[in-house]
Structure formats: C-alpha cells, structure tokens
C-alpha cells in the first residue's frame, strides 16, 4: 500500500506548496517550519472529517484558532501569542496559494486575524557581569571549548540569530574591516554586521588553533564545526549555549536568543 496522500487532499497540495516555496528560493528551514505548522492543521482537520481544502471554511479556521488559544503545553502553560501567530501565518499563506492556483474558489483565511499580545521587552536581559560569567564557562584546553568561546563571543558581539551563526563560513569574517557577512538571514537576505575586536580575536584563535582539529575529510568552509567536522545542528547549539548559561549559576535561563536580546539591548544603550 502506498503512503502517498490522496490526490486533491490538503496533504497532497502541501507537497506542491513546499515545492513552490523551494522554487522561489525560500530557505529549507522556512519550508520545514511552514510544513510543520500546516501539517498540524491538516491533522487537526482530518480528525474532524475534513481533508479537502475546498471543505475548509472561515468558521473552521476560527475554531482552530481557538484550539491553539486553549492548548496547553506539558508544563500547563498556554502557547504564547507569538507562537500562536507563528502557527497560523503559514496556514494563511497556504490558502492564499491555493486560491492563486484556483484550487479553492475563495480564500477562507483571507481576513483571519492573528493573535495580538502585549509588546514587552524581554524579561531576561543579561548584565555585562553575567555575560562575562557565561563566557568564562568553556574549557579552553579543548578544541570544542575554544570553539564554544568563539561562538558565545560572536553571539554577544553581533546579536545574530542561531541559524545565521550556524551557516557562517570562514570566508564570511572580515578581520580587517571588523565585519561579518550574514548570508541568507531572515527573509533569505544577506547583510553585513559590525563585529567587535574581542570577538574577532576569539574567532581567529578558534580558526587557527581548534578548527583544524575538527575538520574531517573535505572542508566545505563551515566556520563552526562539530567533532565530526560537520555544521552544528540548531538544537545542539541551543543545548550547548543553554548549558553554559545554567552552569554560570545565574537566576536567568535561556540560550542563543538570550544573547541576542542582551546584545541588541546593549547596542541600543550604547
């Protein structure tokens, strides 16, 4: 028996939608995130006997929106408004595409409003002393420790995102001009980020002393490597950075995004 979705079903059209996104140079990460969000809605709809996009109505989408609002995580906490919006936005894009392709007569998600939460500054912002306590965590006697110190310094100096750091190449760092080129960042756009001398010094130390020990086989130029010579997986990076935050014994928790918020805040203050 084939596991392929039934022709004309939302699941089948999702495969076509993902191919359409890829043809328009959306990043694999963005496509995966949209697939996950839309797939969750498709599974929810299937439990209610709805599998064809033509059978989805505006009231049904509003019901799914209420489902997300009342959903509780394992710890009993509700989904943040931003998380709810993140799960609904791909569904709006999916039905907009279905309407454009004339696979539905009208777009039931056209006027679906996204949840709006209060705009607040992040509660967890590190002080300079707290940052230094975290930066002192890696064991500099090991290649991985020197790599991790360079990673932490880069996050703190640039406020770049987790995936942007993972994708950095050795050729993206301009030591003379004190710049880092971020390729295919948010919106699949490139940008140039000023970088401090201290962070560049740690990156150079890692590049010269530790990275050669981590390269395995062909070197594709990825800046930060695992012990197997590969790019670091997003969840792995989150875990390592979060472990250094926890080991510092602070009252605050977080990982890469904590550094991003802290760096952005300090940039505004200075």
PLM region descriptions:
Residues 1-270:
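Conserved catalytic core of the tyrosine transesterase superfamily
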């Amino acid at each position: 028996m084939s596991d392929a979705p039934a022709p004309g079903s939302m699941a089948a059209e999702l495969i076509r939608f993902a191919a359409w996104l890829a043809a328009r140079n959306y990043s694999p990460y963005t496509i995966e995130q949209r697939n996950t969000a839309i797939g969750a809605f498709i599974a929810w709809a299937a439990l209610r006997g709805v599998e064809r996009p033509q059978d989805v109505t505006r009231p049904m989408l509003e019901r799914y929106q209420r489902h997300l609002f009342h959903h509780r995580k394992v710890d009993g906490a509700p989904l943040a408004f931003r998380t709810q919006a993140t799960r609904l936005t791909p569904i709006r894009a999916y039905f907009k595409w279905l309407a454009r392709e004339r696979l539905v007569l009208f777009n039931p998600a056209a006027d679906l409003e996204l949840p709006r939460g209060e705009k607040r500054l992040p509660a967890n912002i590190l002080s300079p002393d707290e940052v230094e306590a975290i930066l002192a965590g890696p064991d500099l006697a090991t290649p991985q420790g020197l790599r991790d110190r360079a990673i932490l310094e880069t996050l703190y100096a640039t406020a770049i995102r987790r995936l942007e750091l993972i994708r950095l190449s050795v050729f993206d760092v301009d030591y003379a001009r004190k710049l880092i080129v971020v390729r295919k960042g948010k919106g699949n756009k490139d940008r140039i980020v000023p970088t401090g001398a201290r962070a560049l010094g740690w990156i150079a130390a890692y590049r010269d002393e530790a990275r050669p020990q981590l390269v395995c086989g062909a070197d594709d130029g990825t800046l930060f490597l695992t012990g197997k010579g590969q790019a670091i997986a997003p969840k792995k990076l989150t875990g390592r950075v979060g472990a250094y935050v926890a080991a510092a014994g602070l009252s605050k928790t977080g990982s890469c995004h904590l550094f991003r918020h802290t760096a952005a805040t300090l940039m505004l203050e200075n």
